[in-house]
Amino acid sequence: MLKHLLPLGTRDEFGRRARTKQHLIAVIQAHFKQRGLAPIATPLLENEAVFDPYQMGNYQLYRLFGNDGRTLVLRPDMTLPVARFISATNVPLPQKFGYVGDIFRVSRQLSGSYNQITQAGVELVGYASLKAEFECLTIANQLSSELIADAVEIELGDAQFAQRVVASLTGDEGEQQAILTALFDKQVPRYTKLIAKYRAQPLYDFLKAWPRLFGRPECIFKELAAAPLPETVQPSLKRLQTVVAWMQQTMPEQVISVDLSSQAPQKYYTGLTFRGYSQAGAGYLFSGGRYDKLLTNFQAEAEPAVGMGLNVDLLTTLATDQQTAYAEQLIYFEPEQWSQAEAYLAKQPHAILSLADDLAGARIEAQRLNAQLIDLTGGMTND
């Protein structure tokens, strides 16, 4: 019976969901083309060394051995292969890339997550200006409103803020990591115990409130202004304020929040981070950020970059649930009426041809599809 079973964390896609997903991918690719992004496709298989510098979070890699004895992996991420491509080909920079492809991650058992995910994304490489973040945020705003009916909230953060705050408390890297882990995992009792030794420090009141440091920008910035934060975080806060002000001016309908108590979406981010989610769906619809040091793992010279990935599968689930169900029509005809049937089909967006041998078979097919039967024979069949 195993030959009928799918591997854990995978699924077949068929019918309405498959059509919806194909449509969303076409819309995304058209949007990328309209913005001048160069399409890029990297192999499903990569050398494991491509992903060695980074811990890939709460999941493992699919590994296999190549003929040359090297360990290969099914790519768990799209950004690192793009970085590998840039370094290997010496493609001139700056460049804007757009992609759609599948990634593979072995999730924890019983997590409810799929191990195969279709992701679309943008990589803007060689751009140090904040304009790169602005373009990614614009793409996210425009695509989310075009692809699904639900309002999407964009959550902003900073990859270096938390690390710089704890570094101002202690030089002990183990202690720093323990505090950050408890903070990011929302282990409040453990976090409270870890910060207790800093009770005499001016920053202690901020530390106590830190696990709840998320919400509307105005409230968060007011709270931050009252805290004696180290100078090392001021550039991050200024950048956040600049981005929020820009978003409020250019996309006033967009709901924005700030979260400085959560871990960055990827460990290689170095600056502004952003995520988008809908109240109707579990998980983030998209996430991204700046990663100015990623290419140093493949070459000596660093390159500034901003990237973003969209979860096409989650977008498909939301879009499928929101679609209006249209009554399909099933066209029955005799072989000599083929041209007439094709002409009718061309005018009806929700019609399909019945290939049944006789009218009785067409009626059974229409009932199964819950479709209206259009009989071009007028009941005068050759059966």
Curated annotation (Swiss-Prot):
Keyword Secreted: no
Domain of life assignment: Bacteria
Entry's Gene Ontology BP terms: histidyl-tRNA aminoacylation; L-histidine biosynthetic process
Subcellular location(s) per record: Cytoplasm
InterPro entries: aa-tRNA-synth_II/BPL/LPL, HisRS-like_core, HisRS/HisZ, HisZ
Keywords carried by this UniProt record: Amino-acid biosynthesis, Cytoplasm, Histidine biosynthesis
Molecular function GO labels: catalytic activity, acting on a protein; histidine-tRNA ligase activity; transferase activity
Pathway named in the protein's UniProt entry: Amino-acid biosynthesis; L-histidine biosynthesis; L-histidine from 5-phospho-alpha-D-ribose 1-diphosphate: step 1/9
One GO cellular component, as annotated: cytoplasm
Xref: NCBIfam families: hisZ_biosyn_reg
Summary of subunit composition and partner proteins: Heteromultimer composed of HisG and HisZ subunits.
Anything else known: This function is generally fulfilled by the C-terminal part of HisG, which is missing in some bacteria such as this one.
Family (UniProt): Belongs to the class-II aminoacyl-tRNA synthetase family. HisZ subfamily.
Physiological role: Required for the first step of histidine biosynthesis. May allow the feedback regulation of ATP phosphoribosyltransferase activity by histidine.
Protein name: ATP phosphoribosyltransferase regulatory subunit
Annotated source species: Lactiplantibacillus plantarum (strain ATCC BAA-793 / NCIMB 8826 / WCFS1)
Lineage: Bacteria, Bacillati, Bacillota, Bacilli, Lactobacillales
